[in-house]
Amino acid sequence: TVGEGRCNLSLGTSGTLFISSGKFGVDAHNALHSFDHADGGYHLMGCMLSAASCNKWWMDEILKTTEYAREQEKIKNLGENRVFFLPYLMGERSPHNDPDARAMFLGMSMDTTREDMTQAVLEGVAFGLRDSLEVARSLGIRIERSKICGGGAKSPLWKKILAAVLNLKLDLIESEEGPGYGGAILAAVGCGEYESVQAACEKLVHVVDTVEPEPVLVEKYEARYQEF
């Protein structure tokens, strides 16, 4: 992911937003990390410590099931869940920088279902990623779409939620192993196969599917995010 305002979302154990930028971006609270690339340009990074690992904890340790897809198939009313999940199982890095932050469910009632809580976990991670995205936007960085990779990207439902919460088009790339693939691309540039990282990415990174944010869900999730 190279080029002004381009973004990559890695939805693995942790959740990381990598945002390409032509300028060094630091906010007043150091909420995001900013790095200088060897051949020019910068990237901002927002990293939440627990992302897909929140879902793994919920499914494996609490529900005691490995049927991830089956559990998610039961979720129907997106954007209407009254339960919130704060995804801070290991403290939090970006943008809060608080090792003492802790996870919790909020808003449960006698009507709360298993599906509501599963949905809340997926949404809570999406809201946590939105926190970092909002910091980048406050720095004047305009982002309209992002590539997505990592184990969590295998879930169609989660991608749909993320697209709506972030209000971004999400491009799924051909290779699921984003970090390894990126390392190979950098090696190809270093060996002289391509004149720049951007040229290599344009040639080697192939989008196989795009999830568009649905306007109705964007509106519903905007209200939910403001509550979060």
Can you say where each PLM-predicted feature lies in the sequence?
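Active-site core segments that coordinate phosphate-bearing ligands/cofactors
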Residues: 1-227
